[in-house]
């Protein structure tokens, strides 16, 4: 008979930030008796999740990919955004061999160059400066037919901000005398990650075939028409500009998003000959270029390949023969697996995974509970089994509902999490387990932009809570100075395991 484990649990409350402002703060306005009691009873602090603390430039807000990479790595991980940003500054971007070769191929074979990506300064999935730079590169290389397929944001920036990004881009095109915006579509369709292939199909048919729901005379006109229909940027329906343009066999298609999770499905639509999600009709092969590595087994040219992270938390525990569980609903499953494991897709030895399907609704404000209760049921069963040394669980609600910008729905999401926390605490107390509660970034604590007074749907730069739920006596080593890179060393300290040399983060707990 296997011995029962003294399970440690890391709870990641996605998008649960901290702000002293009460107004428009869904977390402060919610009824959270369990959360309040945990804060009153147990050791707690705040940690940092944005900018240089997580390997991003300056004051760039954090996000789930960046957060989970840092959580699992136990060190500050220099992000793709930062790598590319630095190369834009020193000019190396324009010498990137993969990008240069693709443009040379287009010139030599009289092929068009298509550039697609999310046009905003949100910095979570892409950045407008990088798309501007790609356009400049086509100009420097003398490319003739350069077509832009732009995704509008409205989620990692203001809901109706597309016009300013498009105006800047059109000014860049005018200066260079290169490029033509031929299609516009909201990220809701082009960047799905939850196998809602009907959305991806809308984007694919627009970009590949020029088949659109609407026709506009310019990109700005497309946005104007969308607003008149009551759509915000995230939800702009497929629109062709002037004359529909289709992709021809052998054309170059460069995808300028750098974050993997929302890039995978649309990439598969263009590159997977055996695509199961929807019928494309005749498959048209392209010279598809990924800005970063979206998935190893895609076997596609990558401008900025991933660098390997050694001795991340999951691998380190696996090498020690320990057992671990990763559990989340669909929307955050990749984060507690792929990203937390440093970009490794396959589970490590001794690592189990449980995926709880996210509800099939258009937007999560329609069901703010999401699948939190089903997730909690599965988590409780795993806790009671006492077969795991470490369980890592992500609750998606405060981030996914927070992105809707709907305050009342987000309050409901917070209260759902609070109910689940009560059940989880009881189960962990029964087995004498310990819980570390934190978040990957803020979101739900700021539902209105305090400067513009517009609905705020993006992440924040606010710190996030840290609570150590245990009967054990401990102190916070450096109150309010910690970062996400300190979480893995903290978990190892809770398990009485020395951290590996690669982990430069430090335990936030000192045990008495």
UniProtKB/Swiss-Prot annotation:
One Pfam family assigned to this protein is iPGM_N
> What does the note under cofactor report?
Binds 2 manganese ions per subunit.
What does the record list as coiled-coil region(s)? none
Q: In which pathway does it act?
A: Carbohydrate degradation; glycolysis; pyruvate from D-glyceraldehyde 3-phosphate: step 3/5
User: What keywords were assigned to this record?
Assistant: Glycolysis, Isomerase, Manganese, Metal-binding
Single Gene Ontology BP term? Answer: glucose catabolic process
**GO terms for molecular function, please?**
manganese ion binding; phosphoglycerate mutase activity
Q: Where is the active site?
A: 64
Please indicate if the UniProt record lists Acetylation as a keyword: no
One Gene Ontology cellular component annotation? cytosol
Q: What is its EC number?
A: 5.4.2.12
Does Isomerase appear among the keywords? yes
What are the binding positions for Mn(2+) 1 in this chain? 399, 403, 459
What is this enzyme's catalytic activity, as reactions? (2R)-2-phosphoglycerate = (2R)-3-phosphoglycerate
Cofactors (names): Mn(2+)
Listed transmembrane segments = none
- UniProt signal peptide: none
- What CDD domains does the entry give? iPGM
Q: Where does substrate bind?
A: 125, 155-156, 187, 193, 259-262, 332
- Residues annotated as binding Mn(2+) 2 are 14, 64, 440-441
The family line of this record is: Belongs to the BPG-independent phosphoglycerate mutase family.
Q: Can you state the subunit structure given in the record?
A: Monomer.
Provide the function of this protein: Catalyzes the interconversion of 2-phosphoglycerate and 3-phosphoglycerate.
Q: What is this protein called?
A: 2,3-bisphosphoglycerate-independent phosphoglycerate mutase
